[in-house]
Regions:
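Multi-pass alpha-helical membrane architecture of UbiA-family
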Residues: 1-231
Length: 231
Protein backbone atom coordinates (compact mmCIF):
# COMPACT_ATOMS: atom_id res chain seq x y z
CA UNK A 1 0.00 0.00 0.00
CA UNK A 2 2.80 2.43 0.86
CA UNK A 3 4.38 1.98 -2.56
CA UNK A 4 1.04 2.62 -4.24
CA UNK A 5 0.46 5.73 -2.15
CA UNK A 6 3.98 6.95 -2.94
CA UNK A 7 3.16 6.74 -6.64
CA UNK A 8 -0.14 8.55 -6.12
CA UNK A 9 1.22 11.42 -4.06
CA UNK A 10 4.28 11.87 -6.25
CA UNK A 11 1.99 12.32 -9.23
CA UNK A 12 -1.10 14.03 -7.79
CA UNK A 13 -0.13 15.75 -4.53
CA UNK A 14 3.63 16.12 -3.87
CA UNK A 15 3.98 16.34 -0.10
CA UNK A 16 6.76 18.89 0.32
CA UNK A 17 5.54 21.46 -2.20
CA UNK A 18 1.93 21.16 -1.02
CA UNK A 19 2.91 21.43 2.64
CA UNK A 20 4.89 24.54 1.80
CA UNK A 21 1.86 25.87 -0.08
CA UNK A 22 -0.31 25.22 2.97
CA UNK A 23 1.91 27.40 5.15
CA UNK A 24 2.19 30.07 2.46
CA UNK A 25 -1.60 30.33 2.08
CA UNK A 26 -2.13 30.44 5.84
CA UNK A 27 0.69 32.93 6.38
CA UNK A 28 -0.37 35.16 3.51
CA UNK A 29 -3.88 35.72 4.81
CA UNK A 30 -2.65 35.82 8.42
CA UNK A 31 -0.14 38.61 7.89
CA UNK A 32 -2.18 40.62 5.37
CA UNK A 33 -5.01 40.75 7.89
CA UNK A 34 -2.74 41.79 10.77
CA UNK A 35 -1.00 44.39 8.60
CA UNK A 36 -4.29 45.99 7.56
CA UNK A 37 -5.55 45.99 11.15
CA UNK A 38 -2.32 47.64 12.26
CA UNK A 39 -1.29 44.77 14.54
CA UNK A 40 2.47 44.85 15.13
CA UNK A 41 2.69 42.82 18.32
CA UNK A 42 2.10 39.27 17.15
CA UNK A 43 3.28 35.84 18.25
CA UNK A 44 3.81 32.62 16.33
CA UNK A 45 3.45 29.17 17.86
CA UNK A 46 1.83 25.77 17.65
CA UNK A 47 -1.50 27.24 16.51
CA UNK A 48 0.03 28.72 13.37
CA UNK A 49 1.71 25.38 12.63
CA UNK A 50 -1.62 23.59 13.02
CA UNK A 51 -3.23 26.19 10.76
CA UNK A 52 -0.73 25.53 7.98
CA UNK A 53 -1.12 21.78 8.39
CA UNK A 54 -4.90 22.18 8.24
CA UNK A 55 -4.71 23.99 4.91
CA UNK A 56 -2.38 21.26 3.60
CA UNK A 57 -4.56 18.41 4.88
CA UNK A 58 -7.82 19.96 3.72
CA UNK A 59 -6.51 20.51 0.19
CA UNK A 60 -5.26 16.92 0.17
CA UNK A 61 -8.76 15.74 1.10
CA UNK A 62 -10.22 17.79 -1.76
CA UNK A 63 -7.66 16.33 -4.18
CA UNK A 64 -8.60 12.76 -3.28
CA UNK A 65 -12.32 13.59 -3.26
CA UNK A 66 -12.00 15.01 -6.78
CA UNK A 67 -10.33 11.81 -7.94
CA UNK A 68 -13.21 9.80 -6.51
CA UNK A 69 -15.81 12.06 -8.14
CA UNK A 70 -14.11 12.12 -11.54
CA UNK A 71 -13.16 8.44 -11.68
CA UNK A 72 -15.42 7.49 -14.59
CA UNK A 73 -14.52 10.50 -16.73
CA UNK A 74 -10.82 10.19 -15.85
CA UNK A 75 -10.81 6.60 -17.12
CA UNK A 76 -11.69 8.02 -20.55
CA UNK A 77 -9.85 11.33 -20.54
CA UNK A 78 -6.88 10.76 -18.22
CA UNK A 79 -6.37 6.98 -18.10
CA UNK A 80 -2.70 7.29 -17.12
CA UNK A 81 -3.41 9.03 -13.81
CA UNK A 82 -2.63 7.04 -10.69
CA UNK A 83 -6.19 6.26 -9.58
CA UNK A 84 -7.98 5.45 -12.86
CA UNK A 85 -4.95 3.45 -14.06
CA UNK A 86 -5.07 1.25 -10.96
CA UNK A 87 -1.67 2.30 -9.63
CA UNK A 88 -3.41 3.06 -6.35
CA UNK A 89 -6.57 1.49 -4.95
CA UNK A 90 -9.66 3.22 -3.62
CA UNK A 91 -9.24 1.48 -0.27
CA UNK A 92 -5.73 2.99 -0.02
CA UNK A 93 -7.08 6.49 -0.52
CA UNK A 94 -9.99 5.86 1.85
CA UNK A 95 -7.49 5.07 4.59
CA UNK A 96 -5.55 8.25 3.83
CA UNK A 97 -8.74 10.34 4.00
CA UNK A 98 -9.78 8.75 7.31
CA UNK A 99 -6.37 9.37 8.90
CA UNK A 100 -6.15 12.86 7.42
CA UNK A 101 -9.53 14.01 8.73
CA UNK A 102 -8.99 12.37 12.12
CA UNK A 103 -5.62 14.07 12.63
CA UNK A 104 -6.91 17.46 11.49
CA UNK A 105 -9.95 17.23 13.74
CA UNK A 106 -7.89 16.29 16.81
CA UNK A 107 -5.33 19.03 16.18
CA UNK A 108 -8.00 21.68 15.70
CA UNK A 109 -10.00 20.54 18.73
CA UNK A 110 -6.91 20.63 20.96
CA UNK A 111 -5.01 23.67 19.74
CA UNK A 112 -7.18 26.02 17.70
CA UNK A 113 -9.57 28.72 18.91
CA UNK A 114 -11.99 28.51 15.97
CA UNK A 115 -13.16 24.91 16.03
CA UNK A 116 -16.65 25.80 14.82
CA UNK A 117 -15.16 27.43 11.72
CA UNK A 118 -13.06 24.30 11.20
CA UNK A 119 -16.23 22.18 11.32
CA UNK A 120 -17.87 24.52 8.82
CA UNK A 121 -14.86 24.17 6.52
CA UNK A 122 -14.94 20.39 6.73
CA UNK A 123 -18.71 20.25 6.28
CA UNK A 124 -18.40 22.29 3.08
CA UNK A 125 -15.62 20.04 1.82
CA UNK A 126 -17.62 16.89 2.53
CA UNK A 127 -20.68 18.33 0.80
CA UNK A 128 -18.46 19.10 -2.20
CA UNK A 129 -17.26 15.50 -2.26
CA UNK A 130 -20.91 14.41 -2.40
CA UNK A 131 -21.84 16.92 -5.12
CA UNK A 132 -24.10 18.63 -2.55
CA UNK A 133 -26.41 15.65 -3.11
CA UNK A 134 -27.14 17.00 -6.60
CA UNK A 135 -24.71 15.03 -8.76
CA UNK A 136 -27.22 14.61 -11.59
CA UNK A 137 -27.38 18.40 -11.98
CA UNK A 138 -23.94 19.66 -10.99
CA UNK A 139 -21.83 17.04 -12.79
CA UNK A 140 -23.44 17.99 -16.10
CA UNK A 141 -22.98 21.76 -15.71
CA UNK A 142 -19.52 23.33 -15.55
CA UNK A 143 -20.86 26.78 -14.51
CA UNK A 144 -22.99 25.19 -11.77
CA UNK A 145 -19.97 23.23 -10.55
CA UNK A 146 -18.01 26.49 -10.39
CA UNK A 147 -20.72 28.29 -8.43
CA UNK A 148 -21.07 25.48 -5.89
CA UNK A 149 -17.47 24.31 -5.57
CA UNK A 150 -15.21 27.33 -6.03
CA UNK A 151 -16.44 29.19 -2.90
CA UNK A 152 -14.54 26.58 -0.87
CA UNK A 153 -11.49 28.84 -1.22
CA UNK A 154 -13.49 31.62 0.44
CA UNK A 155 -14.49 29.25 3.25
CA UNK A 156 -10.83 28.32 3.71
CA UNK A 157 -9.92 32.01 3.87
CA UNK A 158 -12.67 32.51 6.45
CA UNK A 159 -11.18 29.74 8.60
CA UNK A 160 -7.85 31.60 8.72
CA UNK A 161 -9.41 35.04 9.22
CA UNK A 162 -11.58 33.77 12.07
CA UNK A 163 -8.52 32.37 13.84
CA UNK A 164 -6.71 35.70 13.59
CA UNK A 165 -9.69 37.74 14.74
CA UNK A 166 -10.22 35.53 17.79
CA UNK A 167 -6.54 35.33 18.72
CA UNK A 168 -5.89 39.07 18.46
CA UNK A 169 -9.36 40.18 19.57
CA UNK A 170 -10.13 41.92 16.27
CA UNK A 171 -13.62 43.01 15.30
CA UNK A 172 -14.41 40.70 12.36
CA UNK A 173 -17.20 42.55 10.58
CA UNK A 174 -15.17 45.24 8.85
CA UNK A 175 -14.45 46.27 5.29
CA UNK A 176 -10.84 45.23 5.88
CA UNK A 177 -11.65 41.62 6.70
CA UNK A 178 -14.17 41.47 3.85
CA UNK A 179 -11.62 42.74 1.33
CA UNK A 180 -9.01 40.25 2.55
CA UNK A 181 -11.58 37.49 2.23
CA UNK A 182 -12.57 38.48 -1.32
CA UNK A 183 -9.21 39.65 -2.64
CA UNK A 184 -7.49 36.35 -1.92
CA UNK A 185 -10.49 34.45 -3.27
CA UNK A 186 -10.18 35.90 -6.76
CA UNK A 187 -6.83 34.29 -7.68
CA UNK A 188 -8.36 30.86 -7.04
CA UNK A 189 -11.43 31.78 -9.11
CA UNK A 190 -9.30 33.11 -11.98
CA UNK A 191 -7.09 30.01 -11.97
CA UNK A 192 -10.06 27.64 -11.92
CA UNK A 193 -11.61 29.25 -15.00
CA UNK A 194 -8.36 29.92 -16.87
CA UNK A 195 -7.18 26.31 -16.65
CA UNK A 196 -10.31 25.26 -18.52
CA UNK A 197 -9.83 27.58 -21.49
CA UNK A 198 -8.21 26.10 -24.60
CA UNK A 199 -7.55 27.07 -28.18
CA UNK A 200 -10.04 25.51 -30.63
CA UNK A 201 -7.42 23.08 -31.97
CA UNK A 202 -6.66 21.84 -28.45
CA UNK A 203 -10.24 20.99 -27.45
CA UNK A 204 -11.00 17.37 -26.56
CA UNK A 205 -13.94 15.52 -25.01
CA UNK A 206 -13.06 17.32 -21.77
CA UNK A 207 -15.61 20.06 -21.01
CA UNK A 208 -14.07 23.54 -20.96
CA UNK A 209 -15.38 27.10 -20.70
CA UNK A 210 -13.95 27.83 -24.13
CA UNK A 211 -16.02 24.97 -25.56
CA UNK A 212 -19.17 26.30 -23.88
CA UNK A 213 -18.72 30.03 -24.46
CA UNK A 214 -15.89 30.36 -26.97
CA UNK A 215 -12.24 31.04 -26.16
CA UNK A 216 -12.51 34.79 -26.84
CA UNK A 217 -15.43 35.41 -24.47
CA UNK A 218 -13.86 33.18 -21.82
CA UNK A 219 -10.54 35.03 -22.07
CA UNK A 220 -12.24 38.42 -21.82
CA UNK A 221 -14.08 37.23 -18.71
CA UNK A 222 -10.74 36.26 -17.13
CA UNK A 223 -9.36 39.72 -17.91
CA UNK A 224 -12.40 41.34 -16.29
CA UNK A 225 -12.00 39.23 -13.15
CA UNK A 226 -8.31 40.14 -13.00
CA UNK A 227 -9.09 43.85 -13.25
CA UNK A 228 -11.74 43.56 -10.53
CA UNK A 229 -9.22 41.80 -8.29
CA UNK A 230 -6.61 44.50 -8.90
CA UNK A 231 -9.06 47.31 -8.17
Amino acid sequence: MLKRLHIYFKEMYPFFSRLLLGFIVFGEIYFILLLNYGVTDFSLGIQEIVGGITVFGFLMFLRIADDFKDYESDKRLFPDRAFPSGKVYKKDLNIVVAVDLAVLTILNAVFMNNFLFYLFLMAYGILMSLWFFQKHKISKSLPLALVTHNPVQMVLNLYIISFCCIKYDLYPFTLTSFLVLMTLYFPALIWEIARKIRAPKDETEYTTYSKLFGHKKSTIFILILTLVDIV
